[in-house]
Amino acid sequence: MSSPVSLENAASTSNKRVVAFHELPSPTDLIAANPLTPKQASKVEQDRQDIADIFAGDDDRLVVVVGPCSVHDPEAAIDYANRLAPLAKRLDQDLKIVMRVYFEKPRTIVGWKGLINDPHLNETYDIPEGLRIARKVLIDVVNLDLPVGCEFLEPNSPQYYADTVAWGAIGARTTESQVHRQLASGMSMPIGFKNGTDGNIQVAVDAVQAAQNPHFFFGTSDDGALSVVETAGNSNSHIILRGGTSGPNHDAASVEAVVEKLGENARLMIDASHANSGKDHIRQVEVVREIAEQISGGSEAVAGIMIESFLVGGAQNLDPAKLRINGGEGLVYGQSVTDKCIDIDTTIDLLAELAAAVRERRAAAK
């Protein structure tokens, strides 16, 4: 990390609780060190259009955003991508598989905030290195012809890697945030807004409408300059049902209630994890199958599903004493350090079931 900027000359009333400012490379410089190739950029654009077409009802496939709750080990993430890529190709007629590659984690109170914030998992907060690692992982996944999906949490970090992203999400804790609605209005890919943590759907409905409109707000240019950002609005926004403290909302009745609110041609995504499964990876398998039943039964409203999946099922605690950098034996390879995930073998079976459900829906529509 760069040396902190001194605060000695700051006005006596300013920055009383700021310890230091650590400079970041500009987005332009970081991207130039690891750019997309023209072929990769073209693939990202096509993936974005495919996803937009599915949510618009112009493509009858199902978007499946699947991958780890969070990326903490780049090597394991790429191993997972190598398992997923052939499946994405084989099931492409029925599913648009997008790898979930999340680097930023919102915390209810405190905790590890993701690979960008603390890439070494040891509270050294080497954010410049985290940005470099994140960009490399994304490009490595894109190079496997896999679209990537990310949650956008920090309002300035997308400038460093959003060019690689085919689909984005605004999480349950930030859907009501004006900052994130404005951010979504300028993003170049389709964006999903989750319902609130309490299960409130209206905040996501409002967020979609807000993001569809132009905005002016404070932001950072590609050169790193503080700027007024003017956006055109993002017409490719949709709702993600993730359940809440009020209970799950992945069932057919909940989907129908949202359709009534949005209009008969509404299309949405369902998160099979989080409050829809109680963060239980075993229950998540059942939720995926319940959603597949809706699809095979003819529901056109379900255009996407999100699944938390990794090489090894379950989750482990992020114990600093286990880290090799601290002399420990190391974490379990390929297992989540945040929410519990479905293992890769079970995931493969579920993807085949979802593809079959799409084929049944397609046949019934003829």
Swiss-Prot record:
One biological process term in Gene Ontology: aromatic amino acid family biosynthetic process
Record's function text: Stereospecific condensation of phosphoenolpyruvate (PEP) and D-erythrose-4-phosphate (E4P) giving rise to 3-deoxy-D-arabino-heptulosonate-7-phosphate (DAHP).
Pathway the protein contributes to: Metabolic intermediate biosynthesis; chorismate biosynthesis; chorismate from D-erythrose 4-phosphate and phosphoenolpyruvate: step 1/7
Gene that encodes the chain: aroG
Disulfide bonds: none
Top EC category: transferase
A GO term, aspect molecular function: 3-deoxy-7-phosphoheptulonate synthase activity
Organism: Corynebacterium glutamicum (strain ATCC 13032 / DSM 20300 / JCM 1318 / BCRC 11384 / CCUG 27702 / LMG 3730 / NBRC 12168 / NCIMB 10025 / NRRL B-2784 / 534)
Entry keyword Chloroplast: no
Official protein name in the record: Phospho-2-dehydro-3-deoxyheptonate aldolase
Pfam families with a match to the protein in the record: DAHP_synth_1 (PF00793)
EC number(s) stated in the UniProt entry for this protein: 2.5.1.54
Gene Ontology cellular component list: cytoplasm
UniProt family annotation: Belongs to the class-I DAHP synthase family.
PANTHER family: PHOSPHO-2-DEHYDRO-3-DEOXYHEPTONATE ALDOLASE DAHP SYNTHETASE (PTHR21225), PHOSPHO-2-DEHYDRO-3-DEOXYHEPTONATE ALDOLASE, TYROSINE-INHIBITED (PTHR21225:SF12)
Keywords from the UniProt entry: Amino-acid biosynthesis, Aromatic amino acid biosynthesis, Transferase
Tagged with keyword Transferase: yes
Catalysed reaction, written as an equation: D-erythrose 4-phosphate + phosphoenolpyruvate + H2O = 7-phospho-2-dehydro-3-deoxy-D-arabino-heptonate + phosphate
